[in-house]
Amino acid sequence: MLERTLRVLEYNKVKEQLLEHTASSLGRDKVKHLVPSTDFEEIVEMQDTTDEAAKVIRLKGSAPLGGITDIRSNVKRAKIGSMLSPNELLDIANTMYGSRNMKRFIEDMVDNGVELPILETHVAQIVSLYDLEKKITNCIGDGGEVVDSASDKLRGIRTQIRTAESRIREKLENMTRSSNAQKMLSDSIVTIRNERYVIPVKQEYRGVYGGIVHDQSASGQTLFIEPQVIVELNNALQEARVKEKQEIERILLMLTEEVAVEADIVLSNVEVVANLDFIFAKAFYAKRIKATKPIVNNERYMDLRQARHPLIDPEIIVPNNIMLGKDFTTIVITGPNTGGKTVTLKTVGICVLMAQSGLHIPVMDESEICVFKNIFADIGDEQSIEQSLSTFSSHMVNIVDILEKADFESLVLFDELGAGTDPQEGAALAISILDEVCNRGARVVATTHYPELKAYGYNREQVINASVEFDVNTLSPTYKLLIGVPGRSNAFEISKRLGLSDRVIDQARNHISTDTNKIENMIAKLEESQKNAERDWNEAEALRKQSEKLHRELQRQIIEFNEERDERLLKAQKEGEEKVEAAKKEAEGIIQELRQLRKAQLANVKDHELIEAKSRLEGAAPELVKKQKVNVKNTAPKQQLRAGDEVKVLTFGQKGQLLEKVSDTEWSVQIGILKMKVKESNMEYINTPKQTEKKAVATVKGRDYHVSLELDLRGERFENAMARVEKYLDDAQLASYPRVSIIHGKGTGALRQGVQDYLKKHRGVKTFRYGDMGEGGLGVTVVELK
């Protein structure tokens, strides 16, 4: 990729923003060396990797990359036998902990059902060195000091040091508190010089204490003397300190040797966490600029939906739809300067560079982008004072270089093509240059203010005109790209708005040819037609959304009605069964009582009287039971029943659908939300529903309207939404729905991606797709069930 192209498209500014999201110097080093790739497979993998990291951020908010530092030089020094300092060893331990923590973090997410195949592969390369990590942290404290517990010998030596220091201080403090101290000492303090304890003695009393003079004040009036009485104690203290230093060096060498043994593994782990830091920096940057993963194709076309420039404030930038490579291979954007043409040009270029670097791009979901082997850009005014080149010459030098290298795998961006020279000659050159590049099969976006190029798009196949809309009322560009509409200067309208008289403007119009006036009027009508078409589309879209809302409300009311009906049915059935049971118990009780009376010969009761008594009791049972007995006795299905048939269950007088035969005489029947076993003798065949042709919108078998044909997840949290999807698909399968719709909205695409990831692994899902224009488009996934 040409360095000039990266510069004029401000690729390095994107990298500067990306650097802000790295967690370590390792990640920053990766970003600094980032360049766009031209390998299709590598780009697809990089995009998928960034997408997985973005999924982690959506679910967890962050990634545990703290504590990781660039320890590569220290590890290499350990390999060649150099002793590492405590802080260097501590950095190694912290980095080992960070890599181990990152590995556990990703693996825990995978264990909980989150699909992260690429990140899982990355962390699988991390080898835990927990034992070495603990050895270092057990020997070195957080402040970088070797702790007493590093070895028993070190603990003993430091005990000796503390004891010696205590004895020395005690003796010296006794001296400073004596009655003569005020006279002979400059100050009643104990201090240290040359690592030995001393007291400040006035010059004239140097002989009183004896001992060794280690230092004197600037004036020479005070001597820092080590009194003779503590010389031996100070000597013992120094010997202990030498032993301490030797033991510390032994411990550090031991730890350094342990690092050297595992050096290759440590360096491998560092490379993995460096890549992870780099990957998550991309994901955090995508979140910052509200970017999404583009679909990468190898067919040399792009479809950028609502594309934005990443370096412009998203609150003020106007997003545009930019298509190139299918219906046309060249876009010529015409119109006046300061209209936003260059921003559109740079947006195309930087989006391609970002995508080929594995970065998500600031576009809507389902945007597509292709891979270019070369990207050429001639943008901006780059006069060369050293080479005495004018603006035109500078551009032409660059264009000559482009024409030497451009081919069918190239994207070429021309800004103000042919500018800086005679307009007529410049326009002719622009047309010739465009023809040359187009004939090579390159994809081209060019801007110009020459009116001669307005007809270019109409006279060439695979070329289309475009313009950036200009509001003559506010005298400012709207920055909205109008594909298919060439630009116009608006000079007369702007002049009139600024106060130029109609007489002068009319005279100016007379100087323009009739053909030019006709072209300008035609362009004005095209702009107006496009605005009207867009307004009509927006109105139609609003009506469609209103219709969808009414449809959902109707579905909700139907569900509530059926639920209430089924609830009442269940309640009535339960009450009926309770009454039947109560009547039966009462009858049995009376009969038992009569039998006992007869046995006791307390009453002359015959069997036929018992039967009559039971009949009278049964006559008191609810009408429901009597109806059931009559129906069971007098009816039998004459039609051979099959699963899917619609029947009437005589017990309840309700229609149901046969699910499966559970025995020779019983079927499992679905009645509303109820599923129950019913005998064949207690049902009446109605019909066999015809197999209707499957439509784009899901239909329902039988009459089960209790499960909605669509599930609305908009506004739901990610975890709640996934739980609702799982339950909804189970309910839809029980209701034998062939097809349902899941509304997730467009938004950032997180919910959509989560839904579709879940659908891929659901055993009950046959296929799924996005909704058509009338079904909700990208905001809806239509699911076909098995």
UniProtKB/Swiss-Prot annotation:
Uppermost EC category: hydrolase
Keyword ATP-binding: yes
EC number: 3.1.-.-, 3.6.4.-
Smr domain boundaries: 711-786
Matching Pfam families: MSSS (PF20297), MutS_V (PF00488), Smr (PF01713)
Gene Ontology molecular function: any one: mismatched DNA binding
Signal sequence, start to end: none
SMART domains: MUTSac, MUTSd, SMR
InterPro entries reported for this sequence: DNA_mismatch_repair_MutS_C, DNA_mismatch_repair_MutS_core, DNA_mismatch_repair_MutS_sf, MSSS, MutS, MutS2, P-loop_NTPase, Smr_dom
Keywords tagged on the record: ATP-binding, DNA-binding, Endonuclease, Hydrolase, Nuclease, Nucleotide-binding, RNA-binding, rRNA-binding
Domain of life: Bacteria
GO biological process: mismatch repair; negative regulation of DNA recombination; rescue of stalled ribosome
Sites where the protein binds ATP: 335-342
Protein family according to the UniProt entry: Belongs to the DNA mismatch repair MutS family. MutS2 subfamily.
Subunit field text: Homodimer. Binds to stalled ribosomes, contacting rRNA.
Function: Endonuclease that is involved in the suppression of homologous recombination and thus may have a key role in the control of bacterial genetic diversity. Acts as a ribosome collision sensor, splitting the ribosome into its 2 subunits. Detects stalled/collided 70S ribosomes which it binds and splits by an ATP-hydrolysis driven conformational change. Acts upstream of the ribosome quality control system (RQC), a ribosome-associated complex that mediates the extraction of incompletely synthesized nascent chains from stalled ribosomes and their subsequent degradation. Probably generates substrates for RQC.
Identification of the protein by name: Endonuclease MutS2
Organism classification: Bacteria, Bacillati, Bacillota, Bacilli, Bacillales
Gene that encodes it: mutS2
